[in-house]
């Protein structure tokens, strides 16, 4: 079943492969019948549905698929629906229900009523007929006139008979679809003439077309909208070029259908042995090889919107060679072939038709199916048109209009057997069913006329018979009024068709008369049929008379073997009576023709107007729905375009920002240059103004000095005159001395006045220059501030616009997703509604179809093979003529195209000529531009020369300014002297102010020192009380140590006594030193905790920075993937066909949404991590500040005395118990720190809580970062996270520990914490440090001396916890520390010797352990003599331990 499988994800998509040789077994048919609800035993009449459904192919869009478990299911790639059962099963279940209901409905009552109504009208026919004919009775040999073919003409000139002929052909194509499972019909006499072969061919085609009628309609429903425009163009344009005018082929081609379709037939087992089941696919192909002729005829009515789509149209367009090959064996241009040749052809036709059917089926499976132009309109308007056409049909009195209109509909179903003809749209109105019947009748009449009757006589009898029959039928029609249609013939909407369908093509009256003679007297329906035939003949008689060519119709063999044996015994009397009656009917026929010429034209116009209005309405509705869908799609595409435009806008904004920055920078540079030029100009103006001011002031000073000198001279001269006059009498010596003194005094005063004036003038000039410079600096600073503010504002606005654009883009993305969901739901609802409407119409059409086919299912099977050869002969002739016409049209089109090509070339030459003119004009313009550029260069050179002249003038002005400055140097010297005096005065004032401020500060310091001394006194009293308490503890411990077995102390306390203090004071001093050491150790541990937490915070910051970078990379990758997905989605929407890549696009979209969700979670987690880090830093700062306050308070209490302790050191192997027993002297309960323990505990707990929350956040970040990104999105794995260590001060402050145990625990804690903080899982590497830095460093140095191979760790401590992210939370570290720090028992419970032995064993084990190499870089003891020296410990002024060598 499957070939060329396609793998989509984990699903395997298979392809359906039809096997022509496959024949289902009876067991398979029975099983499938039970599946669709048929009981094979009780309902054998419904088994044909099971045989048909088991071979039904998959509808379009459905494909079989196989999942990973091997189960098969069916998936619709158009709607996305998936089911387990075959898609056709449910459809055939509904058909079974409809057939069952139709069988249960009563159907015989209507037939009886119709027979009663028609008994009175057909009494004359009963009298004329001598004996009723039964099945197998002999047939009369009568002649029929020959009719010719009308010339070819366009679609606009087609008479009503052309459309009528096309509809009559469709009866054969749909006549025998329901021939199985129908109730038994009453017996009926055979007609006078043989049934047409063409009708039989169309009957078998109807079987093939209707065997899968519902399946074809259901599967191709969605293809109809896509192929509307193509079918409209192909059918309408080609039909205008080529079609057959069947009105001239004989109007009697249809009238014989009416009695055969209106009278119910009895099922004949001898004629149809397969009546209980439908033919197998082989039979369908063999019987329906020529069905393309019938199905192609529906295109004319489709062009008018009268029927649904034609299932044969696409295939006729696709393969003209196959159609010509199918028609070749059926053509028989020879008109006088014997009946044996037709019998021989009957045997050959099934084989040849079977082969042709296989070819057609293969080509139909490969070629795409195209729907006709008016499928959508005909489905909607079908119900509204049925009743209107049927009313017109009743007025015309045509009982046979039901099946003929049914043919025009062509049922709207698409057959699975695709027939191919040469451009089938051009052959749409080929031969009608009535034409086939006429050919068969004419053939028999020609055989009879060879012996007795001449051809002109037959024409004469034909005319008289036609007139007589029409007059009688017209009188019957006026009496009867509107007639009812027979049961089994559904009231189709297309029953009468457009006006052309309500009338039939003209038929020869001789055939009507023969039909009247040969009809049995017991049939009550013959009168109605003849009446309808007469109307059809009368309406189309003018069309037949216009034809000038007479073409001989090929004779055909009799209907069946029974008919052949019965022909020689037929009486000749019947024919003579028919001739007499025909002569009587000629006058009546003329009146009937005149009456009926006007009636069909009015009816036709009215019907066409109604149909056009309905078609326009439906077309408008369709256009509206399509426009709505297009608008929605355009909105979606517009939103996607807006997204792309937003991205483009962002890029443009970034470019614009860069351009703005460059512009701002260039503007600032230009502005600075401008400011510089303005400053230079302003300075130049100031200098010039200062020079003018100096000149003016100098002139004024000189004038003032001259005036003062003149005044002084005048005063002196007056005084001298008065003095001379007064002292003239006195001594001349005194006068001269006094004059000398006065002159000297006046000269000094004059000099002082001149100096004072000059100093005052210089000060004023200096103030003026400084004020101008200050104003200039203020102007420059204000301008710079404005420039910076403008730049900041522009950058802020650009940032705001970028943020707004990003926010709008996110909103648009959300809106697009919601819109896509709404659009998909809307389309799904619309598709379901259309499917329901279509199923409802299909069910109604099927019911009517089955009723119509019940009467005509077993009539034309035997006659089909005989008529096929004759019809194919005529068809080949027509095809040749069509080909010639087509070639002529192609030649004319080719000439027109050559002419158009020549015109295009001529226009192209004109364009080239114009372009050359434009090039010449362009070259002239370029020359003008070059000339203008040369002029501009000359002008630029002139401007450059003028600039040079200006520069020379500026240089000259600068030289003049320098000369002016040289003249003012002596004035500046005088200014300097004046300023020096002023500065000395200001310095004295500043010194006085500084002394006052210093005095205030000293007073405040005195107050602070007094308060501090009070606080220190209080603290000293508390320390004395603590010392007293610890002395008591020391006494108790000394008593216990005296009771121990090894009394030799290793610690010489006598060496500490430098004064004559008592033992009590010595113990107090030692306890004080130990308590301070413990306090230092606790403080140092807290400091180490703070440093470790600081390292952890830095590591956390680095980790967050790395996570931010990785998140940005993932965001960029996500944006690129989204753009790629949008591009793929747009390209997939542009393609009309359904692609399998839509599922991949859907998966990609899900992955993109999941990636955006992960990135949002990472953003929130990183934001929370930043907040926690800030809180942790604040807590650490608070803890550090509290510790600093504590240390500052303790430093004030430290003394300057140095306390020393000596140790008698020996080799490590010779450590005696006596030296170790002195250690309990150092085992003193430490004093708690002076810091507030509640505050420290609160800060520690808050730090622990923050660290635990930070641990959770970082774990979330690591898990998010470790998730694999979707297609195309890559992110690096999270880097190893930071680690943190927590060393609580309470571990150091625990009382009752021995000094050795404390030292060992401290030494084990310190490397463990450093190991966690820096290098997890690889051991600790501590660098050596100076022993004078901290207490911890000193202790580490001592432990290196005692343990050269490294500091011993706790033997039972587990390894540090490992984390896949590298991060260790504070709670886990505390838990690990609690587990790794075993409580060392007190010395009063365990002996010192056992402790020494255990330590030795541990040291040996630690040395031999190759895995632990902790302090490989620690210095080892070089010689044992250094250890034997005396060492002394002492405290310096900073309260630090130092080692003194002796």
UniProtKB/Swiss-Prot annotation:
Boundaries of every WW domain copy: 56-89
Pro residues bias locations: 1267-1281
GO biological process annotation, one example: DNA repair
InterPro entries: MT-Golgi_org_protein, WW_dom, WW_dom_sf
Basic residues: compositionally biased ranges: 109-121
Polar residues composition-biased segments: 164-176, 288-312, 451-461
Biased composition (Basic and acidic residues): 257-277, 355-372, 384-397, 490-499, 525-534
Domain of life, per lineage: Eukaryota
Chain spans, region Interaction with ATRIP: 1-195
Keyword Flavoprotein: no
Compositional bias ranges of the Acidic residues kind: 218-228
GO cellular component: 9+2 motile cilium; apical part of cell; centriole; ciliary transition fiber; cilium; cytoplasm; glial cell projection; nucleus
Disordered, as annotated region: 106-132, 159-185, 217-238, 250-408, 424-570, 830-849, 1261-1287
Coiled coil feature spans: 1143-1197
Known role: Plays a role in microtubule organization and/or maintenance for the formation of primary cilia (PC), a microtubule-based structure that protrudes from the surface of epithelial cells. Plays a critical role in G2/M checkpoint and nuclear divisions. A key player in the DNA damage-activated ATR/ATM signaling cascade since it is required for the proper phosphorylation of H2AX, RPA, CHEK2 and CHEK1. Plays a critical role in chromosome segregation, acting as a mediator required for the maintenance of genomic stability through modulation of MDC1, RPA and CHEK1.
PANTHER family: CENTROSOMAL PROTEIN OF 164 KDA, NUCLEAR MITOTIC APPARATUS PROTEIN 1-RELATED
Protein name per Swiss-Prot or TrEMBL: Centrosomal protein of 164 kDa
Originating species: Mus musculus (Mouse)
């Amino acid at each position: 079943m499957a070939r060329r499988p396609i793998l989509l994800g984990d699903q395997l998509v298979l392809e359906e492969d039809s096997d022509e040789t496959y024949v289902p077994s009876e067991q398979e048919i029975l099983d499938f019948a039970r599946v669709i609800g048929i009981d094979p035993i009780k309902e054998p009449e419904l088994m044909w549905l099971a045989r048909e459904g088991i071979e039904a192919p998959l509808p379009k869009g459905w494909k079989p698929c196989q999942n990973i478990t091997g189960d098969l299911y069916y998936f619709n790639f158009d709607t996305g629906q998936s089911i387990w059962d075959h898609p056709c099963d449910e459809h055939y279940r509904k058909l079974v229900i409809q057939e069952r209901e139709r069988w249960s409905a009563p159907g015989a009552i209507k037939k009886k009523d119709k027979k009663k109504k028609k008994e009175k009208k057909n009494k004359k026919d009963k009298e004329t007929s001598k004996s009723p004919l039964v099945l197998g009775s002999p047939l009369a040999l009568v002649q029929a006139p020959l009719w010719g073919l009308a010339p070819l003409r366009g679609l606009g000139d087609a008479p009503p008979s052309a459309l009528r002929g096309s509809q009559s052909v469709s009866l054969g194509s749909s006549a025998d679809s329901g021939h199985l499972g129908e109730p038994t019909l009453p017996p009926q006499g055979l007609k006078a003439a043989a049934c047409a072969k063409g009708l039989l061919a169309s009957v078998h085609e109807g079987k093939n077309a209707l065997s899968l009628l519902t399946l074809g309609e259901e599967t191709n429903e969605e293809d109809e909208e896509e192929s509307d425009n193509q079918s409209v163009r192909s059918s309408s344009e080609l039909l205008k070029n080529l079609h057959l005018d069947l009105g001239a082929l004989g109007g009697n081609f249809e009238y014989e259908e009416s009695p055969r379709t209106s009278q119910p037939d009895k099922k004949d087992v001898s004629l149809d042995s397969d009546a209980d089941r439908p033919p197998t696919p082989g039979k369908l192909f063999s019987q329906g090889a020529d069905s393309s002729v019938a199905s192609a005829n529906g295109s004319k009515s489709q062009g008018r919107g009268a029927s649904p789509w034609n299932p044969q149209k696409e295939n006729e367009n696709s393969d003209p060679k196959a159609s010509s090959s199918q028609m070749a064996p059926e053509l028989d241009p020879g008109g006088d072939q014997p009946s044996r040749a037709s019998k021989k052809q009957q045997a050959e036709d099934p084989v040849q038709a079977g082969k042709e059917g296989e070819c057609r089926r293969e080509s139909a499976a490969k070629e795409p199916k195209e729907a006709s132009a008016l499928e959508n309109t005909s489905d909607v308007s079908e119900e509204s048109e049925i009743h209107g056409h049927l009313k017109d049909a009743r007025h015309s009195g045509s009982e046979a209009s039901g099946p003929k209109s049914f043919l025009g509909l062509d049922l709207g179903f698409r057959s699975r057997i695709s027939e191919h003809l040469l451009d089938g749209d051009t052959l749409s109105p080929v031969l009608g069913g009535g034409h086939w019947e006429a050919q068969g009748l004419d053939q028999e009449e020609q055989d009879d006329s060879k012996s007795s009757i001449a051809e002109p006589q037959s024409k004469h009898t034909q005319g008289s018979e036609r007139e007589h029959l029409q007059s009688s039928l017209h009188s019957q029609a006026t009496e009867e009024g509107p007639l009812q249609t027979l049961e089994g013939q559904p009231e189709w909407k297309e029953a009468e068709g457009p006006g052309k369908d309500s009338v039939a093509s003209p038929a020869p009256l001789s055939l009507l008369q023969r039909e009247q003679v040969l009809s049995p007297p017991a049939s009550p329906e013959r009168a109605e049929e003849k009446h309808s035939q007469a109307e059809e003949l009368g309406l189309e008689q003018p069309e037949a008379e216009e034809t000038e060519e007479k073409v001989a119709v090929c004779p055909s063999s009799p209907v069946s073997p029974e008919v052949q044996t019965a022909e020689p015994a037929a009486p000749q009397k019947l024919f003579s009576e028919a001739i007499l009656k025909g002569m009587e009917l000629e006058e009546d026929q003329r009146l009937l023709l005149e009456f009926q010429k006007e009636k069909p034209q009015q009816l036709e116009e009215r019907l066409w107007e109604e149909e056009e209005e309905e078609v326009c309405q439906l077309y408008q509705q369709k256009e509206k729905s399509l426009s709505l869908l297009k608008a929605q799609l355009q909105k979606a595409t517009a939103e996607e375009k807006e997204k792309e435009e937003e991205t483009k806008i962002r890029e443009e904004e970034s470019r614009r920002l860069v351009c703005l920055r460059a512009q701002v920078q260039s503007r600032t540079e230009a502005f600075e240059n401008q400011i510089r030029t303005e400053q230079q100009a302003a300075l130049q103006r100031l200098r010039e103004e200062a020079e003018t001011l100096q000149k003016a002031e100098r002139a004024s000073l000189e004038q003032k000095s001259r005036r003062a000198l003149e005044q002084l001279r005048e005063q002196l001269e007056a005084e001298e005159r008065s003095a001379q006059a007064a002292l003239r009498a006195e001594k001349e010596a005194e006068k001269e001395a006094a004059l000398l003194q006065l002159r000297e005094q006046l000269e000094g005063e004059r000099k002082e006045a001149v100096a004072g004036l000059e100093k005052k003038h210089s000060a004023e000039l200096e103030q003026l220059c400084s004020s101008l410079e200050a104003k200039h600096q203020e102007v420059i600073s204000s301008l710079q501030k404005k420039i910076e503010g403008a730049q900041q504002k522009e950058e802020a606005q650009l940032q705001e616009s970028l943020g707004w654009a990003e926010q709008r883009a996110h909103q648009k993305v959300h809106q697009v997703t919601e819109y896509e969901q709404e659009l998909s739901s809307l389309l799904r609802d619309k598709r379901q509604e259309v499917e329901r409407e279509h199923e409802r119409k299909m069910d109604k059409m099927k019911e009517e179809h089955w009723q119509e086919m019940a009467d005509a299912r077993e009539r034309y099977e035997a006659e089909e093979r005989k008529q096929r050869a004759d019809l194919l002969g005529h068809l080949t002739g027509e095809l040749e003529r069509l080909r010639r016409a087509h070639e002529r049209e192609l030649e004319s089109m080719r000439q027109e195209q050559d002419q158009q090509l020549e015109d295009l070339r001529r226009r192209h030459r004109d364009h080239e000529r114009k372009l050359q003119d434009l090039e010449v004009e362009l070259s002239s313009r370029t020359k003008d531009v070059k000339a203008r550029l040369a002029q501009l260069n000359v002008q630029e050179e002139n401007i450059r020369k003028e600039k040079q002249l200006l520069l020379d003038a500026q240089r000259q002005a600068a030289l003049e300014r320098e000369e002016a400055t040289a003249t003012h140097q002596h004035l500046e010297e005088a200014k300097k002297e004046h300023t020096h005096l002023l500065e000395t005065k200001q310095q004295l004032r500043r010194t006085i102010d500084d002394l006052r401020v210093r005095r205030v500060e000293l007073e405040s310091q005195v107050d602070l020192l007094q308060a501090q001394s009070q606080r220190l006194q209080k603290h000293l009293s508390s320390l004395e009380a603590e010392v007293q308490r610890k002395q008591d503890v020391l006494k108790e411990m000394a008593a216990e140590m005296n009771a121990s077995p090894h009394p030799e102390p290793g610690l010489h306390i006598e060496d500490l006594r430098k004064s004559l203090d008592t033992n009590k004071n010595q113990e107090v001093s030692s306890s004080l030193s130990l308590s301070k050491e413990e306090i230092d150790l606790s403080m140092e541990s807290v400091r180490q905790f703070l440093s470790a937490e600081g390292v952890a915070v830095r590591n956390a910051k680095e980790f967050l920075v790395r996570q931010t970078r990785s998140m940005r990379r993932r965001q960029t990758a996500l944006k690129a993937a989204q753009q790629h997905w949008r591009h793929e989605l747009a390209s997939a929407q542009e393609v009309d066909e359904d692609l399998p890549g839509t599922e991949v696009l859907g998966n990609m979209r899900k992955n993109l949404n999941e990636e955006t969700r992960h990135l949002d979670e990472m953003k929130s987690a990183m934001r929370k991590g930043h907040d926690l880090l800030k809180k942790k830093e604040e807590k650490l700062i608070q803890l550090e500040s509290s510790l600093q306050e504590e240390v500052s308070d303790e430093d004030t209490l430290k003394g300057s005395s140095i306390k020393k302790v000596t140790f008698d050191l020996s080799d490590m192997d010779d450590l005696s118990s006596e030296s170790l027993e002195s250690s309990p002297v150092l085992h003193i309960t430490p004093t708690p720190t002076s810091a507030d323990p509640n505050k420290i505990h609160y800060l520690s707990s808050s730090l622990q809580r923050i660290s635990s929350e930070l641990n959770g956040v970082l774990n979330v970040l690591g898990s998010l970062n470790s998730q694999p990104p979707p297609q195309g999105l890559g992110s690096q794995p999270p880097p190893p996270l930071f680690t943190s260590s927590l060393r609580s001060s309470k571990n150091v402050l625990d009382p009752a520990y021995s000094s050795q145990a404390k030292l060992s625990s401290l030494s084990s804690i310190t490397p463990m914490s450093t190991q966690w903080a820096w290098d997890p899982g690889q051991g600790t590497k501590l660098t050596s440090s100076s022993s004078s830095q901290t207490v911890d460093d000193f202790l580490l140095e001592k432990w290196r001396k005692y343990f050269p191979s490294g500091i011993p760790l706790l033997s039972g401590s587990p390894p540090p916890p490992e984390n896949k992210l590298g991060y260790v939370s504070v709670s886990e570290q505390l838990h690990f520390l609690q587990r790794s720090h075993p409580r060392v028992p007190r010395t009063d419970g365990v002996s010192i010797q056992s402790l020494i032995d255990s330590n030795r064993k541990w040291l040996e084990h630690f040395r031999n352990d190759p895995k632990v190499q902790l302090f490989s870089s620690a210095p080892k003891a070089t010689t044992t003599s250094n250890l034997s020296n005396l060492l002394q410990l002492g405290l310096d002024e900073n309260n630090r331990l130092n080692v003194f060598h002796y």
